[in-house]
Design a protein with these regions (language model features):
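Outer-membrane beta-barrel translocator domains and adjoining extracellular loop/strand segments
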Residues: 164-179, 224-240, 256, 282-291, ...
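Membrane-proximal, glycine/serine-rich, low-complexity loop/turn segments characteristic
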Residues: 5-10, 14-233, 243-278, 305, ...
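Surface-exposed extracellular loop regions of Gram-negative outer-membrane beta-barrel proteins
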Residues: 105-127, 229, 273-279, 284, ...
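Outer-membrane beta-barrel transmembrane domain signature of Gram-negative proteins
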Residues: 249, 284, 288-368, 380, ...
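C-terminal beta-barrel architecture of Gram-negative outer-membrane proteins
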Residues: 141, 520-527, 542-585, 589-617
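Outer membrane beta-barrel strand-and-loop segments of large Gram-negative receptors
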Residues: 304-306, 352, 439, 443, ...
Length: 662
């Protein structure tokens, strides 16, 4: 976009698609980046923002500190919402690497600003088919604009069917008087999943407000998740036996969401969001080992309610003050039958409150201070109410060297709540040596993070260097202990984790047609105490985009990884990944085909852990992680005046508190 000019605080910046504003980076897509993108994720990927990792295949957007929150015109968005964005309807993108105002509290924020229309409509169709195994993703949508109002209907169907995950596993269980060894080899695996969704949405937008109402329905069914395995036992007893593990799941979730953003005055805004959902989950597992049979059947009803309100006022000298109140509530009832009969009723609620103050100090310094608290409550029907108060704080200090360079330091304090599927008093049979058990008395996890970063936009080069230290107190992790002749797998919250991390991120624009992005990461993780686990790893990735007329070619790759899973306390080693794609874009058509790991037949995912009484190593392979290909076709037909493509802000995840075995 060599010819584009951007006016910023009375300074015109020419030829730059990255513009550093007071509290965020304004990213202006050029024609090449827009033309060769089919979705909102494609466009974000093409922008090659140095500190962002965008997986356009899975819709995951993250930065070094964690997952990035996505917004469209200031409204919080989910995967489908961004996936359904039409790139040519996007004016620009705001990247809040140090979120302030309504975005305060996020690790980082992306806000898509779209071109709004007042008449016309569209019909869109898109489909993606994987080559190498069965996976299809098909969507249809329509939108009608009339004045300040818009109405949309979106629907989709996703199906997967492949040979499942095959495992080779060695285990050692150290009982007081003897040791048992077990080798597991998968002989057959089958997996099938189907998902459907429907969304109805009405929106009214004026200069004073943006309000919407949305009704959604999600159905997610896994009719087949089967594994047949050969078990070889040695040590105390020596024998071989076959096992079969069959699981079925079915979830249905309707939800209603109301959203309103109000410009009270030119300097004051108020945002309110309320969402409620009901979920019906069914889970069945049958495990056989020789003539022994284990059965679990669970019916669950889950109610969820989320409410948030944000107020922000702009003060003099580019300062601002805001407040944020949130409450998240879940109530679940599960009826277990089979090996263990039980009724589990749990409610969990977390209330959070924050103040946010942003202060400019002279021309070079700025500070963002966000103090607050979390009040977490949960109660299992057989236990007393658990209550945890936590201090939360985000503070960022920025020194602006010049318009293209910054130094930044941050100190953050937070907390993390346990997953609702951990909080129960249930026992579940894993196999006839192991039991999985819930724990309703888990502590509140505390997070402490200190970071420093240098960021620069230097002509064609954009880069970032940063270092981060993180300490996690009362980390929730897997716990193993012996009970009679069984190994019990449960949960604990009395261990700490320390992370020392460093990163180099850069992107370079060789020409209008050729762009590249490079990331390098260093991770050093320590889990002191009982197990004294340490791991070091270096990870690098490279992405290259080349544009020529209506064609775009992408090549990407990342090195093998080694990381400690802070929940399982296992060291996980993942293989290198590489791939390429070519796309053709013309008017309303976007056609893309690609391949991942085209020269790799046997990608293996390795995992191992050593505990005082239980050690294991595991290698997993799956058809979906070997060499595969895909073809994706999208077409949009506009009628009347062209309109922005509707954004499906459905959350297609289905919540569940059911404790399941792997």
């Amino acid at each position: 976009m060599e010819s584009d000019n951007v006016i910023l605080n009375e300074v015109v910046v020419k030829g730059s698609s990255y513009v550093r504003k007071t509290d965020h980076v304004l990213v202006i897509p050029d024609k090449q980046q827009v033309k060769h993108a089919g979705t909102g994720y494609d466009l974000l990927y093409n922008l090659m923002i140095p500190s962002l990792e965008v997986n356009k295949r899975t819709g995951k957007v993250s930065t070094f500190g964690g997952e990035v929150a996505l917004y469209i015109n200031g409204e919080k968005a989910e995967y489908e919402e961004v996936q359904n964005l039409r790139p040519r309807d996007i004016k620009n993108i705001e990247y809040y690497d140090t979120p302030t105002g309504k975005y305060a509290g996020d690790v980082a924020s992306i806000n898509y600003i779209t071109k709004e229309r007042t008449s016309g409509g569209y019909v869109s169709l898109d489909g993606k088919q994987t080559i190498g195994y069965l996976m299809g993703n098909y969507n249809i949508g329509t939108k009608l604009m009339h004045g300040n109002n818009s109405y949309s209907v979106l629907g989709g169907y996703i199906t997967q069917k492949y040979d499942g995950v095959k495992t080779s596993k060695n285990e050692e269980i150290l009982f007081p008087e003897y040791t048992t060894h077990r080798n597991t080899q998968t002989t057959q695996a089958d997996y099938q999943n189907n998902q459907q969704y429907l969304q109805l949405k009405a929106n009214n937008r004026t200069e004073k407000h943006n309000i919407s109402a949305q009704l959604s329905l999600v159905h997610n069914e896994t009719p087949k998740n089967n594994n047949s395995e050969l078990l070889d036992y040695s040590g105390h007893h020596t024998y071989s036996i076959s096992s079969a593990n069959q699981k079925k799941e079915d979830g249905l979730s309707p939800s209603v969401k109301l959203y309103g953003n109000f410009n009270i005055t030119p300097k004051q805004t108020l945002e309110v969001t309320a969402k409620t959902a009901y979920t019906q989950n069914d889970y069945t597992r049958t495990y056989t080992e020789g003539e022994n049979i284990s059965l679990t059947d669970v019916d669950e009803e889950l109610y969820a309610f989320d409410f948030s309100t944000r107020y922000n006022i702009k003060l003099e000298h580019n300062n601002s003050l805001g407040a944020n109140l949130q409450h998240h509530h879940k109530v679940t009832s599960s009826s277990y039958t089979g090996d263990y009969d039980s009724w589990q009723h749990l409610w969990m609620g977390e209330t959070m409150f924050f103040l946010n103050y942003n202060q400019r100090i002279a021309k070079k310094f700025s500070m963002n201070f966000l103090p607050g608290f979390s009040w977490l409550n949960y109660k299992l029907h057989t236990d007393a109410r658990q209550q945890h108060w936590s201090l939360r704080m985000n503070s960022t200090f920025i020194y602006t060297i010049n318009k293209s360079q910054q130094l930044m330091a941050s100190v953050d304090i937070g907390n993390d709540q346990p997953d609702i599927s951990y909080i129960n008093s249930m026992d579940q049979t894993v196999d006839f040596l192991q039991i999985k058990r819930g724990n309703p008395h888990l502590d509140n996890t505390k997070l402490y993070v200190v970071g420093i970063a240098y960021k620069a936009q230097l002509n064609r080069l954009n880069f970032q260097i940063l270092g981060v230290y993180q300490k996690i107190q009362n980390n929730i992790s897997t716990d193993y202990y012996l009970e009679n002749d069984k190994l019990v797998s449960s949960f604990r919250s009395d261990m700490d984790v320390e992370h020392w991390n460093a990163a180099l991120d850069l992107s370079y624009r060789f020409s209008d047609n050729l762009r590249a992005k490079f990331n390098a990461r260093y991770y050093h993780t320590i889990i002191p105490g009982e197990y004294n686990i340490t791991d070091n790893s270096v990870i690098a990735s490279l992405d290259i985009n080349y544009y020529w007329k209506n064609l775009a070619i992408n090549v990407y790759g990342s090195t093998a990884t080694s990381r400690i899973n802070r929940f399982s306390l296992a060291i996980e080693k993942n293989p290198a990944i590489y791939g390429t794609s070519i796309s053709w874009s013309h008017k309303g058509w976007h056609v893309e085909t690609g391949t991942e790991n085209p020269f790799t037949k046997h990608n293996r995912y390795r995992e191992y852990a050593n505990f005082s009484i239980y050690n294991y190593s595991r290698i997993q392979t799956s058809r979906i992680n070997q060499r595969t290909g895909y073809i994706k076709i999208a077409y949009t037909f506009d009628f009347g005046q062209k309109t922005s493509r509707e954004k499906s802000d459905m959350d297609r995840n289905i919540n569940s508190a059911i404790m399941k075995t792997n």
